[in-house]
Amino acid sequence: MGLKKACLTVLCLIVFCFGIFYTFDRVNQGERNAVSLLKEKLFNEEGEPVNLIFCYTILQMKVAERIMAQHPGERFYVVLMSENRNEKYDYYFNQIKDKAERAYFFHLPYGLNKSFNFIPTMAELKVKSMLLPKVKRIYLASLEKVSIAAFLSTYPDAEIKTFDDGTGNLIQSSSYLGDEFSVNGTIKRNFARMMIGDWSIAKTRNASDEHYTIFKGLKNIMDDGRRKMTYLPLFDASELKTGDETGGTVRILLGSPDKEMKEISEKAAKNFKIQYVAPHPRQTYGLSGVTTLNSPYVIEDYILREIKKNPHTRYEIYTFFSGAALTMKDFPNVHVYALKPASLPEDYWLKPVYALFTQSGIPILTFDDKN
């Protein structure tokens, strides 16, 4: 134990000396500056405990914002970790940043598991976890992320609350049902163990005493009788005033972050006479033959605004496997369709997603993607 503490002390010194604390952080606009954390740890440790919320996607930030709204007056620190940084991520991060006491954006352009990135980032996370004031609750969706375990292992007595990360919470083959973190390489695995001890995915899952779900009426993998399940609707269309669909039809394809979907997406757009594509927040490629909707909003927020402006327009939303199909299917004047390429084998991994769509009343449209 003494050796472990000594190693951790040396690690802290290295982190300070080499500037991993981003004291003069320009790329992240000071969001990873630890000086304020250090000051609070030294001079205000007896203050009110804080709640931590970890996010990896825009959807998770939306859920986190709703959770925070349910606890007015409490202190919240938000930690966003992402390989992506674009207009959408910045917009929603700034939204939640305005509502949190502190917010940190860890932009990891090469991914955490890259050898040159893993050790310094895990070191930074562990040291910063120890600089936090007393932690009351920890909220997270991505149970499989070893980076969050750096904080969980530092505060084993904190309450753990989990929330949905899209359709991954509705599929039995989800990585959230695993036991151990996936860390490639012996050196990285050993370093991870030094940072998180015996913490695991299973330990996080079993410690969760409440789970927030955004999907009503669908079986959730976290609904196993061990915890309270709380429904948390994300998008409210109840106050929209709409009329008959006499204002024309707007067809929108939901983009995919996977580049191999480019050709199939273009064929689908042509086949169904789709005019627009709403890029996925992590999408880096464009599609020919359709107009790209450039907006800082995720598709649900975008459509709600469009319905308000054009209450007589019919909106047709086409998707291959986006969870947004489930969150938008009950919007007024919105008709959602799931696309299934004819070449897709019966045992393809998307089969459970299509089953979800069918269960939710979303039509499945098969098309010839080879011609």
UniProtKB/Swiss-Prot annotation:
Other facts: Present in outer membrane vesicle formulations which are used as vaccines in human.
Biological process terms in GO annotation: lipopolysaccharide biosynthetic process
Catalyzed reactions: a beta-D-galactosyl-(1->4)-N-acetyl-beta-D-glucosaminyl derivative + CMP-N-acetyl-beta-neuraminate = an N-acetyl-alpha-neuraminyl-(2->3)-beta-D-galactosyl-(1->4)-N-acetyl-beta-D-glucosaminyl derivative + CMP + H(+)
Record note on what altering residue 2 to S does: In strain: M982B / NRCC 4725
Effect of residue 129 to A: In strain: 126E / NRCC 4010
Annotated keywords: Cell outer membrane, Glycosyltransferase, Lipopolysaccharide biosynthesis, Membrane, Transferase
Database matches in Pfam families: Glyco_transf_52 (PF07922)
Documented effect of changing residue 280 to A: Decreases the rate of sialic acid transfer
Outcome of swapping residue 168 to I: In strain: 126E / NRCC 4010
Gene that encodes it: lst
Molecular function GO terms recorded: N-acetyllactosaminide alpha-2,3-sialyltransferase activity
The EC number(s) this enzyme carries: 2.4.3.6
Subunit structure: Homodimer.
Location of this chain's protein in the cell: Cell outer membrane
Organism lineage string: Bacteria, Pseudomonadati, Pseudomonadota, Betaproteobacteria, Neisseriales
Annotated organism of origin: Neisseria meningitidis serogroup B (strain ATCC BAA-335 / MC58)
Membrane topology recorded in Swiss-Prot or TrEMBL: Peripheral membrane protein
UniProt similarity note: Belongs to the glycosyltransferase 52 family.
Record-listed CMP-N-acetyl-beta-neuraminate binding positions: 255, 278-282, 299-300, 322-323
Entry keyword annotation includes RNA-binding: no
Protein name: N-acetyllactosaminide alpha-2,3-sialyltransferase
Effect of residue 273 to N: In strain: 406Y / NRCC 4030 and 126E / NRCC 4010
pH dependence as annotated: Optimum pH is 6.0.
Summary of the function given for this chain in its UniProt record: Catalyzes the transfer of sialic acid from the substrate CMP-N-acetylneuraminate to the terminal galactose residue of the lacto-N-neotetraose branch of surface lipooligosaccharide (LOS), forming an alpha-2,3-sialyl linkage. Thus, functions in the sialylation of LOS, which plays a role in the evasion of the host immune response by protecting N.meningitidis from complement-mediated serum killing and from phagocytic killing by neutrophils.
Active site positions: 258, 280
GO cellular component assignments: cell outer membrane
Pathway(s) per entry: Bacterial outer membrane biogenesis; lipooligosaccharide biosynthesis
